[in-house]
UniProtKB/Swiss-Prot annotation:
HAMAP family: RNase_HII_B (MF_00052_B). Pfam families: RNase_HII. One of its GO terms (cellular component) is ribonuclease H2 complex. Manganese or magnesium. Binds 1 divalent metal ion per monomer in the absence of substrate. May bind a second metal ion after substrate binding. The keyword Kinase does not apply. This is Ribonuclease HII.
């Protein structure tokens, strides 16, 4: 009699176990469902947060175009704060063409009147370069020097370029205490020289010099176009474009061409032995000023 209630209690316990497990399973299922619902609700807010995150400003840029920071006056100011003044930047234009001089420029910017929009001349339009050229000349110390094609033929393009850069620095009204030069090579100047690779895109003074050199050379090539018609100097500025190569083959080279550059050398071989006056050659516009050591100060 005593054992029967125990059995029934045990049976009751066994019968209640499935219900307990069932309720636990339901609770787990309900918890999982609510968790999924919560996560599905949270997902849109996360996506919204990502969508609202700050993105690089690309206004005005085409698809796939990377924004490039403009050169700054920061490194010049750091030197000025240490008492180093004047600080110049220098650069050249025209190392790659088949004809015309290398033109070098040196610029000392006024710390209080640094033109806005300075940049590597290659990243500017021709009209913008002209505008900045006038502004730089009106507010800064500027000097320009030329290395003629004859000097390039004699010394090679690198040495002629460094020579012109050095001349430009020494032609400044006030000799700088420090000069930044674009490229890998320091200059043999009477002041401290610092080479900066890609400097025309980093340092404002070099960017200004690149603009002065580019505009000065472009103007000179337009003058050469009048002296040597038919070569198209006014459009390609002496670079080896198809139009220029065709003119070389048709008219032959002038003394403004760099004799040891391959396309020019080939053109000379075709007319070897022909006197210069029979090839349409005229005098070198830059030979006298360069050999006389004159660097024009604008």
């Amino acid at each position: 009699m005593i054992r029967e209630p125990q059995k029934s209690a045990k049976a009751a316990s066994k019968s209640s176990a499935p219900r307990a497990r069932s309720s636990v399973a339901k609770a787990t299922s309900t918890k999982a469902t609510s968790s999924k619902a919560a996560s599905s609700k949270a997902a849109p807010s996360k996506a919204g947060a990502d969508a609202g995150a700050a993105k690089p400003r690309t206004k005005g840029l085409g698809k796939g175009v990377i924004a490039v920071a403009q050169p700054s006056f920061r490194r010049e100011r750091a030197l000025i704060k240490r008492g180093v003044w004047p600080v110049a930047g220098c650069d050249e234009a025209g190392r790659g063409p088949l004809a015309g001089p290398v033109v070098a420029a040196a610029v000392v910017l006024d710390p209080k009147r640094v033109p806005k929009g300075l940049d590597d001349s290659k990243r500017l339009t021709a009209d913008r370069r002209e505008e900045l050229f006038e502004e730089i000349c009106a507010t800064a110390q500027v000097a320009v020097a030329y290395a003629s094609p004859e000097r390039i033929n004699r010394d090679n393009i690198l040495r002629a370029s460094l020579w012109a850069l050095t001349r430009a620095v020494h032609a400044l009204p006030d000799l700088p205490q420090h000069v930044f030069v674009d490229g890998r090579d320091r200059l043999a100047t009477r002041c401290e020289s610092e080479a900066v690779v890609g400097g025309d895109g980093l340092i404002a003074s070099i960017a200004a010099a690149s603009i002065i050199a580019k505009v000065s050379r472009d103007r000179l090539m337009c003058r050469l176009a009048q002296e040597c018609p038919g070569y198209g100097f006014e459009s390609h500025k002496g670079y080896g474009v198809p139009e220029h190569l065709a003119a070389l083959a048709r008219l032959g080279p002038t003394v403004h061409h760099r004799r040891f550059f391959a396309p020019v050398a080939a053109a000379w071989r075709k007319i070897e032995g022909v006197p210069a006056e029979q090839t349409g050659v005229t005098g070198d516009l830059f030979e006298t000023p360069v050999d006389a050591g004159i660097a024009a100060t604008l």
